[in-house]
Amino acid sequence: MQVEEYLNDIAEREGTVHLTLIDPASQSPEAAAEIAKAAVAGGTDAILIGGSTGAVGVALDQTLIKIKEQVDVPTILFPGNAGGVSTHADAIFFMSLLNSRDINYIITNQVMGAPVVYKSGIEPISMAYIISEPGGTVGWVGDAKLIPRNKPEIAAAYSLAGKYMGMHYTYLEAGSGADRPITPETIGAVKHVLGDNKLIVGGGIRDGKTAKICADAGADMIVTGTIVEETDDVRKKIEEIVSAIKK
């Protein structure tokens, strides 16, 4: 089964997919593998690997190798640039940062990375990436024109543009470590125009209650990353979030 099909099937059967994001720059490959193992034990459906800075080269490859030794769920690249591609992953979110002011994040990095993805056989999953306030590091690095929190219609317009350009997934991002997540109003407005296309929401989600609010508003997939770096019990925290968003 292809990774995209796997994720879509979980979304249909269980209501919401949970993805754990691990940044190779934040810990050793061995520590990353232990986090992934605990997250899978807690019920996460797949592991995202990537970050805004430093998630490239040997650190990325070794992190993927160690993670795949410990878990059986899909590993999906979440690249910050063309250097964030590794042949050791199962799939890649092949994305365009639609609200960037920098053409490198809209298409140039994608052009540079596409031949590598093609030759490696990694499964590409097309995705519109949209960053909302507060934006965090990724908003700064990606030079994003942040979507205002109180303007869901703007997020919906960007999402619709991505859908019409053929992108299967839309990712609404508040930024890693954000102090608050995407608003339910924005999630609902975006899901309304996306229809059957899948909506991913990440940033500022630290507990089951917040995750459930996002899922109930229309998120098909929930991403948590910073929390697995901060908590003393990864499995317990992931269990809390997963139990809140599944049917």
Curated annotation (Swiss-Prot):
Its cofactor is Mg(2+). Pathway: Membrane lipid metabolism; glycerophospholipid metabolism. Prenyltransferase that catalyzes the transfer of the geranylgeranyl moiety of geranylgeranyl diphosphate (GGPP) to the C3 hydroxyl of sn-glycerol-1-phosphate (G1P). This reaction is the first ether-bond-formation step in the biosynthesis of archaeal membrane lipids. It catalyses: sn-glycerol 1-phosphate + (2E,6E,10E)-geranylgeranyl diphosphate = sn-3-O-(geranylgeranyl)glycerol 1-phosphate + diphosphate. PANTHER family: HEPTAPRENYLGLYCERYL PHOSPHATE SYNTHASE (PTHR40029:SF2), PTHR40029. It comes from Methanococcoides burtonii (strain DSM 6242 / NBRC 107633 / OCM 468 / ACE-M). It is found in: Cytoplasm. Mg(2+) binds at residues 23, 52. It holds the Pfam family PcrB. Belongs to the GGGP/HepGP synthase family. Group II subfamily. Its EC number is 2.5.1.41. Coiled coil: none annotated. This is Geranylgeranylglyceryl phosphate synthase. It comes from the Archaea. Sn-glycerol 1-phosphate binds at residues 171-177, 203-204, 225-226.
